[in-house]
Amino acid sequence: MEARAKLSFARLSPRKTRLVVDMVRGRGIQDALTILRFSPQPSAKLVSKLLQSAVANAEQKGASDVDRLFVKTIFVDAGPVLKRFTPRAMGRASKIRKPTSHVTVVLADK
């Protein structure tokens, strides 16, 4: 049985989020949540909430044992980039890029 969850338009850089996601790919759910709990990156908190949502989805689908779940697939796609401008000297402006990410996770039984 598989359960999935998706986080869309998260205000996180896809490149930095992939570093966090790579730490939990293929691990058991309890192990993955422990790793994320002690990770200093800001994206770890959102990925942890996403994993908990996927576990809740698995329970709703009738998973017999939640402790047997593991992270089968997890990946980060780049979302749209919000472009802003900040004023600079002599009437110029500089771009500020605010990237977004889409994170998808699939849990499966061992």
UniProtKB/Swiss-Prot annotation:
A GO BP entry: translation
GO molecular function, one term: structural constituent of ribosome
Pfam family, one: Ribosomal_L22
Annotated GO CC locations: cytosolic large ribosomal subunit
Matching Gene3D superfamilies: Ribosomal protein L22/L17 (3.90.470.10)
Coiled coil residues, start to end: none
Cited InterPro entries: Ribosomal_uL22, Ribosomal_uL22_bac/chlpt-type, Ribosomal_uL22_bac/org-type, Ribosomal_uL22_CS, Ribosomal_uL22_sf
Keywords: Ribonucleoprotein, Ribosomal protein, RNA-binding, rRNA-binding
Domain of life according to the entry: Bacteria
Entry similarity comment: Belongs to the universal ribosomal protein uL22 family.
Function: This protein binds specifically to 23S rRNA; its binding is stimulated by other ribosomal proteins, e.g. L4, L17, and L20. It is important during the early stages of 50S assembly. It makes multiple contacts with different domains of the 23S rRNA in the assembled 50S subunit and ribosome.
NCBIfam families given in the database record: rplV_bact
Assembly and oligomerization: Part of the 50S ribosomal subunit.
Name of the protein in question: Large ribosomal subunit protein uL22
Biological classification of the source: Bacteria, Pseudomonadati, Thermodesulfobacteriota, Desulfuromonadia, Geobacterales
Gene transcribed to yield this protein: rplV
